[in-house]
Amino acid sequence: MKFIDEARIEVIAGDGGDGSASMRREKFVPFGGPDGGDGGRGGSVYAIADRNINTLIDYRYAKKHLARNGENGRGSDCYGKGGDDVTLRMPVGTIISDMDTGELIADLTEHDQQVMLAQGGSGGLGNLHFKSSTNRAPRQKTDGKPGERRMLRLELKVLADVGLLGMPNAGKSTFISSVSNARPKIADYPFTTLAPNLGVVRVGPSKSFVIADIPGLIEGAAEGAGLGHQFLRHLQRTGVLLHLVDLAPFDESVDPVAEATAIVGELRKYDEALYEKPRWLVLNKLDMVPEDERKARVADFLERFEWDGPVFEISALTGQGCEALCYAIYDYLAEHSDAHRAAEAEDLAADVRFRDEPPAKGGAAPGDDA
């Protein structure tokens, strides 16, 4: 499955129907008076969150979504029919923003959450509304209002519990395929992963968590180098980060400590909050290290890396240590899930895009650089 995390669409609500300027024409009723009906309202465009959808790929191909116009009013007090609404189903976790103003329209965080993207125009008034004691045969009527038209950006932040960090070829794809149902492309060269992969790890009946594998980072990723920088935002909602390190690189000139340090540096440059997120060190590819050298190599790495957090030694290829790691992750998430949700709510509340301030002139959102 190819994972699409961003799309741009245009939504066009329906125009309201025009009111009717009609007079009652009936035998034996010489002064029938006005009987023009109102126009129907235009259809609106809605988005609804659907947990059964996990990509935005449909919106890469269907970029324009139009609701129906309202029908015009007619004589005999006939009101126009309202235009049909359009409902767009999107993955849970989709963020919808206006491309012209920068306004955050919605953050779809719950299944079946519904939000209006473009409101249909109201219908015009028929001449029936303009009748008065001094104007018994009004010819006035009003036209329907045009519907809203918007260019929207859809961004999907993966709702994963665990995020994988690491240099290209650190074994992240092998790890996620060994512990979950995800089947990413795996090969012995860097940048095998070109798009995020999601996997569900099950540690027992009704006990599971979601893990996300993003493209590997390289030095300079925070400034846009490599592939991983554009997917770092997926990790902002995870509860814990797993930093995978290749402890046995094929190229002997590669220093695992230097690579691990570079990853931490890029994380901090990209987002301080992401840097402060709980992070576990996972030393991978132990099967490539002679058994009598493993203890010394691990100790040397931890000493030079100056790491005092949780450490796990695994081989994603053989599965060694993976089960214990998964159980530890589940226990941690079960213990800290409430705190994680509360922290995420605080982050969303602090987001400038949620404020009630109007956008600055010129289309820039509050907080954007001029």
From Swiss-Prot:
The keyword Hydrolase applies. GO terms for cellular component: cytoplasm. It is found in: Cytoplasm. Mg(2+) binds at S173, T193. Residues 160-334 form the OBG-type G domain. InterPro entries: G_OBG, GTP-bd, GTP-bd_Obg/CgtA, GTP1-OBG_CS, GTP1_OBG_dom, GTP1_OBG_dom_sf, OBG_GTPase, P-loop_NTPase. Monomer. An essential GTPase which binds GTP, GDP and possibly (p)ppGpp with moderate affinity, with high nucleotide exchange rates and a fairly low GTP hydrolysis rate. Plays a role in control of the cell cycle, stress response, ribosome biogenesis and in those bacteria that undergo differentiation, in morphogenesis control. This is GTPase Obg. It comes from Burkholderia lata (strain ATCC 17760 / DSM 23089 / LMG 22485 / NCIMB 9086 / R18194 / 383). The lineage of its organism: Bacteria, Pseudomonadati, Pseudomonadota, Betaproteobacteria, Burkholderiales. The gene is obg.
